[in-house]
Amino acid sequence: MKTFRDFKKKIKNNNNNKNNKNNNINNNNSNNNKNNKNNNNNNSNNIYTPSISIIDNYDTLCSTPQNLKSNLKKNLNINNQEFITSNILEIDWNTIIDIEIIDFGNSIVCLLVTLSSDNLHFNQILIKSTPTIAQECYASVLQNILKLPILDLRLLEKNNEFLEMSSNLLDFSKDDQFLNDFIKSEFEKTFFLIMEFRQNGKKFNELNHKEYFSGYKGQEKFKQLGKIIAFDIFCNNFCKTNIAGDDSSIYFSNIICYETPNKNGWYFSLINSNISCLNNSLFTIGYRYHMNSLKLLLFSIFQNPSTESFQIRMMREHLLKKLNIKLPKSSAVYIQKGIAKGIKSIVNYINYPLLENTKDKVKNIVSCDNYNIWKKGIDSIHCPFLLDVLNEIEIEISNRREKVYFVKI
């Protein structure tokens, strides 16, 4: 099998041959090979170090999303159009040319696999395993109904394709003990998501926030963040968006941000969304605490949409204190408008029969037994909590529907 080093040399040699048509091709190849060796020895910082190398440091091996395309583009001398749209179907696992570990933060770690069958066009996909596979698939179905910006994904079980995928990934990474061990540990899990990968994304805490959220486009981006918050509220995912003000969380850690919108107008992609019910009892303190926080936020938004709510102010203060991210006070109004629009969409499209039907559909995707993680995950999805949230939302909207100050979205 070709190594990434062989592939890199071939691309560099081809480019040099085009620029030096009158030179002898064999001499060019030998000279380039010598130069590559010298450059690797004398100036390794300027040459791409493929992931297939002996690296025993996890932080060194991991990449962050914004660096990925620049690395490949810089070192393979390729143009934007030569990166094809991420294709998660009919993957030829024999064409792997690179493997990276991406740490998105907040315990979200994926494999980024680059494939190419002709050395001219490239396909990049994410491989993700998760202990909350059932909840994540369940949330993805609901997100699709609400037209939220989820990445294209499909479920991969331990079948023939899994065997082909695993054998090729392990064979390609055999010279890198750390990467190989990481892949082996991932393959001990039962279910995997094959996910689309969008180029040029950044994590929320890596943005130039003043520049990114400036102007009219910035207002639209804040509204889109509000829609995402609305869904996380609905799923009791306070650990993600931290509406309750928990200092241990990182806001928006489950999104990737882009400079240009996708075909549906979204500037963001969701890479992780779970139904994370903290408890299932109506009578526990935690349950009522979250419900009361939700009611307070809804009341604030629908009662005074142009006034920053307590929860959104807590969010901005947290971002400034913990991450040194300063969002302007004016952002609160647009975020709250987005939350209101997201809530209205939930009320219009989600109901209790749909929640139960979705649970049944997800349960039927794979065969379940009484012991596997999928079955336990499905059983942990607590529809009564979601129904309680939905009821609270519907009550607030009903109470405010006739008011002139109802938020205009």
Swiss-Prot record:
GO molecular function terms noted in the UniProt entry: kinase activity
Domain of life (superkingdom): Eukaryota
Regions of compositional bias (Low complexity) in chain numbering: 13-45
Keyword Transferase: yes
Pfam families the record matches: Act-Frag_cataly
Protein keywords: Coiled coil, Kinase, Transferase
Coiled-coil boundaries: 5-46
Region (Disordered) location: 1-45
Keyword tRNA processing among UniProt keywords: no
Family statement: Belongs to the protein kinase superfamily. AFK Ser/Thr protein kinase family.
The protein, known as: Putative actin-fragmin kinase DDB_G0268812
